[in-house]
Regions:
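Short acidic, Pro/Gly- and aromatic-enriched capping/linker segments at domain boundaries
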Residues: 1-12
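A short glycine-rich, His/Asp/Glu-containing loop-to-beta-strand
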Residues: 16-90
Length: 90
């Protein structure tokens, strides 16, 4: 199982830089021999500043008017599935 450390920085009420989240994220199950980890998401463009962790949202392949930043790992021999969406992809 893929483990990823995610560090997200932001600003406090005084405008100083802070670490908002420093967490280990585990991959979510997908199809056979495929793993994914959601790193970040936005629900609008331009993106709004959020106080909640967007990886806890109900994320699909894409978000209407937003974006999903996802790390995907395919094991050797697995046929990838490319798709087309009207979305911002990282």
């Amino acid at each position: 199982m893929m483990k990823t450390r995610r560090v997200v920085t932001g600003h406090n009420k005084d405008g100083r830089s802070v670490v908002k989240w420093d967490s280990a994220l585990e991959s979510k199950p997908g199809r056979d021999r495929f793993e994914k980890v959601d790193l970040w998401a936005t629900d609008s463009l331009p993106a709004r500043l959020t106080e909640d962790d967007p990886t806890q949202w109900n994320l699909g392949t894409s978000l209407a008017n937003g974006s999903v930043f996802r790390l995907c790992r395919y094991e050797p021999g697995v046929a990838e599935r490319w798709h087309r969406t009207d979305s911002l992809d990282y």
